[in-house]
Curated annotation (Swiss-Prot):
NCBIfam families: argG, PRK00509.1. It comes from Caldanaerobacter subterraneus subsp. tengcongensis (strain DSM 15242 / JCM 11007 / NBRC 100824 / MB4). It catalyses: L-citrulline + L-aspartate + ATP = 2-(N(omega)-L-arginino)succinate + AMP + diphosphate + H(+). The gene is argG. Its main location: cytoplasm. This is Argininosuccinate synthase. Keywords: Amino-acid biosynthesis, Arginine biosynthesis, ATP-binding, Cytoplasm, Ligase, Nucleotide-binding. Homotetramer.
Length: 410
């Protein structure tokens, strides 16, 4: 048991973690150290601190890690081009290992024997938190109330919170599980659990629905250095400010809405509606620049790496040796990913409107259909003969077998 011991709680102030503080105190008789990791969630963190203390926490940490989140988690994933199942830009997945890292650091600082989290027993986050914590310190005990308590639904949690006098910002009539950070906002649960239901227009927090945006297109210029975005519209910005600026630009143009039924790590499908305006712009711009500067074989292999990288991040394996090794490969591919991309934004659409790089492998003189000295069109005949040789041999062999069959009357 943990009677009298310290337990570090990953605290968000939302429904799940709001009821965990009194529950832990009732069932473990322990001291609660609430830790809110600021990854850019759009909430009043002063209110969260007061709420945690009022709920029974003895101490509250609010850790601002936005800069670290962008530089050490978002940008490496962007450079990898990692997208889960073709749509999901991994907003929640990237934040969880960083949160776990801070929980472990504070547990060490406070001498806590255990870490608790509010992830459900059906979701991916329980895996991400616990695998990350164990990768960093396997001696720390982990408490996952959702897997052991008597509360079986969000409605049960609401009733428990009311009984304990804990204010919560949801009702039984409109229950969405919302996760937000600097990179994205995700919406799950409620009427979204039926994939036939279209998301209500008022669900969106940072993206204006495309049908409500201006009829005029807007252009945005994004500049990269070695795969890292550094400027927007010619202005150098810090990593955090750059994401915020692109969220504003993309959001007002209806960019970045994704509705996805995804395959969870734990084996079931779930539906999520995501808002990722800055991420959408950055992924498209980064890819357009790679088209210019990467050779064919590197680009094709990097596509395979991107898929594996996305799976590792989604599955909570951020601190795995393989992910570290893939980072080394990706960094090598990004040495020449420097240049400017111009994007045209119109009612939720993002259209490439130009790209340039000092390391571009595209040469207009080589690519032209006119006369040139580098490419001799007569050379194409020999290339075609060799390239298609295996098919030619196959056809000749089949013709020979057919003639033989006819000769023997088969």
């Amino acid at each position: 048991m943990l009677k009298g011991e310290k337990v570090v709680l990953a605290y968000s102030g939302g429904l799940d973690t709001s009821v965990i503080i009194p529950w832990l105190k009732e069932n473990y008789e322990c001291e609660i150290i609430a830790v809110c990791v600021d990854v850019g969630q759009r909430e009043d963190l002063r209110y969260i601190k007061d709420k945690a203390l009022a709920s029974g926490a003895s101490k509250v940490y609010i850790e601002d890690v936005k800069e670290e989140f962008v530089k050490d988690y978002i940008f490496p994933t962007l450079k990898a081009g990692a997208i889960y199942e073709g749509k999901y830009l991994l907003g929640t997945s990237m934040a969880r290992p960083l949160i776990a890292k801070k929980l472990v650091e504070i547990a060490h600082k406070e001498g806590a024997k255990a870490i608790a989290h509010g992830a459900t027993g059906k979701g991916n986050d329980q895996v991400r938190f616990e695998v990350s914590i164990r990768a960093l310190d396997p001696s720390i005990k982990i408490i996952a109330p959702w897997r052991i308590w008597e509360l079986k639904s969000r409605e049960d949690e609401i009733e428990y919170a009311k009984k304990k006098g804990i204010p919560i910002p949801v009702t039984k009539e409109k229950i969405y599980s919302v996760d937000s950070n600097l990179w994205h906002v995700s919406h799950e649960g409620g009427d979204l659990e039926d994939p036939w239901n279209e998301p209500k227009s008022d669900i969106y927090d940072i993206v204006t629905p495309p049908e409500k945006v201006s009829d005029k297109p807007e252009y945005v210029y994004i500049e990269f250095e070695k795969g890292i975005p550094v400027k927007v519209n010619g202005k150098t910005l810090s990593p955090v400010k750059l994401i915020e600026e692109l969220n504003e630009i993309g959001g007002r143009n209806g960019v970045g809405i994704v509705d996805l039924v995804e395959n969870r790590l734990v084996g079931m499908k779930s539906r999520g509606v995501y808002e990722t305006p800055a991420g959408t712009l950055l992924y498209i711009a980064h890819r357009e620049l790679e088209y210019l500067v990467l050779d064919k074989e590197t680009m094709r292999f990097k596509e395979l790496v991107a898929q594996k990288y996305a799976d590792l991040v989604y599955n909570g394996l951020w601190f795995s040796p393989l992910k570290t090794a893939l980072d080394a490969f990706i960094d090598e591919t990004q040495k020449n990913v420097t240049g400017v991309v111009r994007l045209k934004l119109y009612k939720g659409n993002v259209i490439n409107a130009g790209a340039k790089s000092p390391y571009s492998l595209y040469n207009e003189e080589f690519a032209t259909f006119g006369k040139d000295e580098v490419y001799n069109q007569k050379d194409a005949e020999g290339f075609i003969n060799l390239f298609g040789l295996s098919l030619k041999i196959r056809a000749l062999m089949e013709m020979g077998r057919k003639d033989m069959d006819e000769a023997v009357g088969r």
